[in-house]
Amino acid sequence: MIEIENKLYIRPEKNGITVYEKDTNLYKFYENLEIKEIEKLNTFKEVQEYLDKKSNLVNTNIDYSQPFRINWLIEERCNLDCIYCFADDKMENNETRENILETANHILNLGFMNVGLSGGEPTISPYLKDVIETFKGKCSINIDTNGTMNQLGDMTKLLKEANVLVRITIDSVNPEILSKVRPCKNKNLNQLEIIKDNIKKLQKENVPIMIHTVVTQINKEYLFDIAKELVNLGVKRWHMYGVNYAEKCKDFYEEIKLTNSELNEVYLAVKKEFGDKINMSVYFDEGNYSANSVLLINSEGKFYLDSIKNGIHYIGKNPKLPTLEEINNDLDTKLHCKGYLWTPSLL
C-alpha cells in the first residue's frame, strides 16, 4: 500500500486498485488499474488528476480478498456509562506496551487501509500515542472518542502529523438529556465544556474533526440545538445514525430506537435548515445483526467478529495473530467491502 500526503491510501488488489480518500471517507475501486502507474507520480495533485481521468474504471467488480477496515477497541475503560454501549460487556484486561505494539504491527502486516481506534474510551489508553506513531504514514487512522478527556487536547500536534480523523460523539447539548443517554461516572465533570475546549484545540491545529450523534427517541427533538452549537464552533462535518441493539439496552431498545423513516425525517428537517453550513450525513441500519461483516480487535489484541445478537467469534488458531486467510475464512469479506465501497450510482 502507498500513502500520498496523508490524503490518499492506495492498495493493489487482484484485479485493480482500491483508493481510500481520507477527506471524503470514500473507498473507490479502479478495475484493471495497476499501482505501478500511481508510483510514477510524485504529488497528491498529480495522483488526483490521474485518477480523475480514470474515473470510468470505478466500479464494484473488486475481487473480495482483503478487508478494508478494522476497529480496535484499544482501551476497555471508559469515563462514561452510555445506555446503549455495545462494548461494555466485551472489554477484557489491558495489555502491556509490548503487546499493544505487537498488535499494531500485525495490523500493518495484514494490509488494512483504515484503522479505527475506539473502546471504551481510547484517549484513556497510555499507549495511544505509541500506536498512532506506529501507524503514522502507513495507514489511515480514525479515533472514536467521547471527547471528554483532556488527553485528547494534549495530543493535537501528533494527531495533525498523522492526519488522524477525530470522531467525537455528541448526543445532546442539553445537560439533562445528556445525563440520560451518556451519563458521566464523575458527576462533577462538565463534559460539554471539555468537549468544546477539545474541539477548539483540535481546530487550532487543523486536525480533521467529525461529530457523531446517536439518534434515539430521547434526543431526536434536540438535534437542532446540536446543529446550532456545531455552527457556533465552526464544525463542518456531522454524521447521524440510529441507536443499534446492544445487550446493555436490550430491555428498553424498542422504546428508544427510531425506524429508518423516522431517522430520515428528523435528518432531513435538520439538513434543510443547516445543510448549507454543515456537511451532514446519515447511516440507516439494515438490521442484519447476524452478519459476520464487522471485524474488530479487543483490548487484549484478539481479533474477532461480532454478530451482536449471536455473540462474538474469535478468529484463527491464535486470535492475537490470525493470518489473512483465517480472517477471510470467517469474515464475510464481500459484505464487509460492499458496506464501504463507493459506487458511481450513488451520485
What are these regions (language model features)?
Residues 30-68:
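Long, charge-rich, low-complexity alpha-helical segments
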Residues 62-99:
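Canonical Radical SAM [4Fe-4S] cluster-binding loop centered on the CxxxCxxC motif
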Residues 68, 111, 291:
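Exposed loop/turn and edge beta-strand positions of beta-sandwich/beta-sheet ligand-binding modules
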Residues 8, 176-292, 299, 308, ...:
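Radical SAM enzyme [4Fe-4S]-AdoMet core and its adjacent flexible, acidic
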Residues 81, 146, 298-301:
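Residue-level recognition of short loop/turn positions
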Residues 97-117, 125-240:
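Radical SAM/AdoMet-radical enzyme domain recognition
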Residues 1-37, 246, 252-254, 275-347:
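Accessory C-terminal segments flanking Radical SAM cores
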